Amino acid sequence: IAAGCGSKRDGLTITNVSYDPTREFYEEYNKVFADYYMAEYGKQIKVIQSHGGSGSQARSVVEGCNADVVTLALEHDISLIENTGLIDAGWKDEYDKDSSPYTSTIVFLVRKGNPLNISDWDDLIKDGVEVITPDPKSSGGACWNFLAALSYARDKNNSEDKQKEFLGKLYANAVSYTHLT
C-alpha cells in the first residue's frame, strides 16, 4: 500500500519508507523511475530508501522520520500515519484497488518429491502435515498468508464457523512460526 506524506520540497531527493521485502524491488524500480523522471521533467531525482518491518516503519514516520512516500505492507500501518494528520484522510480512494500498488502470491514449498502430495489449502489441514509460516503478529507478509487462507476458506464455505474451523486446523498444524521482522 502506498501513500504520500510529508511536505512538498523543491529538491529532487525523496525518501521512500518501505518494508523489508521490497528492498530489492525498489532498488531496480528507482532506476526506472529516475529515467522516467529525467525524460518527463528533464531533471535528475534521487530516491533514498529506508526499509524495516512495516509496523516499525509506520511508527518511525509518526515519530518524525522524514518520509516523502510510504510503501508499507498493511493498511493499518498507513492508517496509523493518517491518524496523525501526516497523510490526508481518504488516501485509500485516490487510486485503483484501494491505493495498493502491488499484490502478493502465496507459494507452498514442500519436501523433495512432495511425499504428502500437497497441492492446495485443504492439504495443509490434513493430519500429519506440518506447516511452517510466519506469525501473523510479526510481519505484513505473515498477515498476507493469513488473509490468503481466510480468503480460501470464505470462497469454500459460507459458514463463518466452517471458516474458523479451517483456520484453526491450519494453524494447529503450524509446528513453527518464523519471525520475519
Stretches found by the model and what they are:
Residues 104, 117-120, 142-149, 166:
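Internal, well-ordered alpha-helical segments in soluble enzyme and binding-protein domains
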Residues 113-119, 152-159:
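Short helix-loop capping/hinge motifs at secondary-structure junctions, enriched
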Residues 178-181:
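Conserved small/polar residues in nucleotide/adenosyl-binding loops
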Residues 161-174:
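Extracytoplasmic surface signature
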Residues 40-43, 156-161:
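Short helix-coil transition/hinge motifs at the ends and kinks of transmembrane helices
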Residues 129-155:
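Extracytoplasmic/periplasmic solute-binding protein
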Residues 8-138:
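N-terminal segment of the mature folded domain
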Residues 3-4:
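C-terminal motif of bacterial Sec signal peptides marking the signal peptidase cleavage site
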